[in-house]
């Protein structure tokens, strides 16, 4: 059975790319709104050539009777300003990192490729296109997990939107 999941979604939300980028790059703050994963910054690099680079550890809590998963990933962010257009691309993929080797009782998943593309369509509105290609190394119960996984991108956008609304009120 193929365990690789291709998950995708798109949405338009009434918040600026600047706010979304700030929230999506605040790795520890993501725990406040992304209920699926626990996030930790392993390493953050100085901006180089307009690219921001971060190494993150994600811990994914699974239902009872299933082993939890984790992923170490590199995240890169590009921003582009062309006149009135503002775009942002966030790409993540799995890597190995000496500070976070695989653990016993936690299965190391693989983020084959994850991408979020943000495109400003009007002042204060952003189109979000999101795609994840992930292998969580599931052997049993894969059908159930796959059903749940298909809902995750939409939940991610909903939680992000709620958090933006909360931040915007501040």
Regions found by a protein language model. Give the residues of each.
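Eukaryotic helix-grip
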Residues: 1-170
């Amino acid at each position: 059975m193929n365990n690789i999941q291709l998950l995708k979604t798109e949405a338009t939300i009434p918040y600026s790319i600047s706010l979304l980028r700030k929230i999506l790059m605040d790795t520890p703050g993501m725990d406040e709104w992304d209920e699926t994963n626990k996030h930790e910054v392993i390493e953050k690099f100085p901006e180089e050539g307009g690219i921001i680079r971060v190494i993150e550890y994600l811990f994914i809590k699974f239902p009872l009777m299933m082993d939890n998963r984790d992923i170490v990933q590199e995240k890169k962010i590009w921003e582009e300003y062309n006149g009135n257009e503002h775009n942002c691309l966030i790409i993540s993929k799995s890597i190995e990192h000496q500070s976070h080797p695989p653990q016993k009782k936690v299965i190391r998943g693989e983020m084959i490729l994850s991408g979020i593309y943000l495109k400003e369509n009007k002042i204060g509105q952003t189109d979000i296109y999101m795609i994840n290609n992930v292998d969580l190394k599931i052997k049993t119960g894969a059908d159930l997990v796959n059903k749940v996984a298909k809902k995750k991108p939409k939940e991610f956008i909903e939680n992000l939107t709620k958090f933006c609304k909360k931040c915007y009120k501040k």
